[in-house]
Amino acid sequence: MTFIPATAEELTAEWVDDAMRSVGVLHGDDHVRGIRVAHLSYGGVGLSGDTVRVHLDGEGAGLPETLIAKFPTAVVANRGMIEGFDGYAREIAFYRDLALQVPVRVPGHYGSAMDPARFAGATDVAAKVVNRLPSRAHLALTADITKFMRPTKRRYVLLIEDMGADTVVHDLEEPPSVEQLCQVAGCLAGLHASFWGRQDLADHPATRTLVTEIPRVFVNVLRGRCRPMAEDRWSSWLTDADRRRLDASTDRFAADLGVINEPHTYVHGDPRSDNILFGAGDPIMLDWAMSSVGHPGYDIGYLLGSSLRRDDKG
């Protein structure tokens, strides 16, 4: 398939049919004759991309009524950031190679396509260059880091099973119950256990360590941008103890990064409640763009830190 749709508007019935057939979802007399694209009830436009529901017209026993299509975000800085750690390609690689291996519920892979990377080692080279910069250059770089997050012209599209029927997404303002979070923690533990010590994951495109080889930049961004932003947004309820914790976590961030990157097992990387579908049975884990080899404690800490209700923290 030489043509790759770059946006939902470019999707065609012919392309969807070919994509689904290429991964064995459609067979023989199964055919997609027409499509209708609709936005999801909860928006579908997030930090990293545009997600839509595609209604399928056609015939055949293997033809589902709908599927989900994912595309990169149109926001330049956001896309540059996601491509900085190869997030779009990382998620496609997960669905192509690992989705059937993980012991957690995930949508089925209905097809995908992306342009080849022009230089797969670009982020590694960038990390080496940045690490050699003097401190003053680091500060200048991080003063407005977004202007350096330039996206590529690569096209990415991912088609997955629509599992939205009879499921609920809990956003971060209305997080799930403690019982539901315990379910997710159990699923993550199963994921971590099943991949524990797998040496073959180190160089897989879905599991490579995230671009965290430049901790000085991250620390400067935290100090120069994130910490003041937190003060501006939440100063009315931040206590002195909160501020001390923020400062301490910033100071030790580089060391924490080293622990997070310890290659123990496969981690989801972004298990917030709004990346999980809740319904009958086990939770369904979505959004694998930040998956990597790392420390399992990161997944659990991220889940509880982002999704545990304030009243349940203690």
What are these regions (language model features)?
Residues 1-155, 279-283:
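Conserved NTP-binding catalytic cores of kinases and kinase-like/nucleotidyltransferase enzymes
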Residues 2-4, 145-151, 157, 166-268, ...:
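ATP-dependent phospho-/nucleotidyl transfer catalytic cores
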Residues 44-58, 68, 250-298:
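Active-site acidic catalytic loop and adjacent metal/ATP-binding pocket
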Residues 76, 167-168, 276, 293:
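Conserved protein kinase catalytic core
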Residues 77-79, 167-171, 285-286:
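Short small-residue beta-strand/loop micro-motif enriched in glycine and branched aliphatics
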Residues 80-87, 173-183, 292-295, 311-312:
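Short alpha-helix boundary/capping segments
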Residues 93, 97, 297-314:
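Active-site activation/catalytic loop segments of kinase-like enzymes and analogous catalytic loops
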Residues 244, 283, 292, 307-314:
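A conserved long alpha-helix in the C-terminal portion of kinase-like catalytic domains
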